């Protein structure tokens, strides 16, 4: 085999490999069971924040720490598991469900992607997340010659991701066969 970069080895076949992995996860009972087991072991029925802060950095005495931690954990729980799902920009999942979905994507595709959003809500918290299918991260034709962009990820000179090109719709979506990219 030819010695080449990991991107060169993987990116050309990424879509086919991911499609096969998703098909396997949907149609193979053993894989489906392993996926469910992974989600259950990592998250369980509900994600629970177990905060252990450094009290001196917060300017708190050790005696004050327990009350502060309890307050933070209760607020997190109210935000994360709100029945109206304000943690999800689409308002369809709780935080635990989003984490379980991310574990599933990571298990099948080796990656998961969430966009942090700011959206006013009745819950009192405006931070929410938008789940994005990893295959929607893609390089548009208009910038395909830009060497700082690979597979829709724009990187700085050190390789740190500084931006993403996201298809507004999945390329195989039923609603349309055309899609736009958003940076």
Summary of predicted features, one role per range:
Residues 1-65:
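N-terminal-proximal low-complexity accessory segments that begin disordered
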